[in-house]
Amino acid sequence: MKKWRRSVLWLILSVCILVSGACSMKSPQQAASKANNQEIEYASNSPTMKGVTIDGARGFMWEVKNNGTTVYLVGSIHLTDDNFYPLHSKYEKVFAEADYLGLEIDFTKAPDEEQQKRIVDMMMYKDGTTLKDHVSKETYAKVKEFLMKNGLEANAYDAFKPWQVEGNISVMSLKADYNLEEGIDLYFLQKALERKIPVIGLETQESQMGALAGFSKERQEKSLNTTLDDYNSGVINDPTDELIEMWKKGDEQTLLKITNSLYSDPEYGKAMLTDRNIGMAEKIEGYLNTNKEDEYFIVVGLSIILCKLF
């Protein structure tokens, strides 16, 4: 069975802030309605991008309606390549009529001073210690080796906690021709700013970082080692090209295999996918219960939508 580099899967499919499984194929409609055991009308003509198209990247999109409110839920990947756009025209048509854009994080609102302090505290050591004091000699040596191979000072990451070091390494290990600034979420954010429609966040920077920082020091070091070993081994498949092609083609079989692989570590799967899915679903349920004839265009990490709820 193919083994994908897990840290890159997290970066592309589920987490949008690292730049600074048995998977249930339940529909997003079911995920949203499950929160309060409420019945929601599933549109029979849900515009999931299937079949052959010649009109741009297909991707994955679902529609759910309740009492006049419509939510379009787009499964996003957080980076693209130079040939990713245009998207299928259905996305542009639906977005042009949307009243709100929903994202994992509302990037138009900066954290306030207190939030910024808490975020920095989650990322960095503030007690006079450094990474070297919190991981084994072997792990620290691997980090130094990685940094020097990439032209950085051996102590460049000393101030960062293990989870942030892992994120930095994941970003640095991506090929130069991938575009972290042109993911689907940021693409539609720019369009929302141009249209001057409200942008809403289903999470915050603090809550998303909290999910990553919430693991024990030992778990963070184990995950950091996995990322370093994957990078150094040369035998682990870099999934980035395959993920991008999967999205372009709307390849559900590859999507299922990749999302399943994220649950190879159940603790990570629960914290990074299942728990976040439930929180987002509750917010989406609130939008569907406004009894207003509004349309919401919501773009979140694809693996969060298609995750195991139980």
Language model features: what each stretch is:
Residues 2-11:
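Bacterial N-terminal signal peptides that target proteins for export
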Residues 19-22:
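C-terminal motif of bacterial Sec signal peptides marking the signal peptidase cleavage site
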Residues 24-26:
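Bacterial signal peptide processing site
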Residues 35-51, 60-271:
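Structured, acidic catalytic/metal-binding patches in enzyme active sites
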Residues 56-60, 280-282:
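Alpha-helical scaffolding within the catalytic cores
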Residues 266-310:
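A cross-kingdom marker for long, charged
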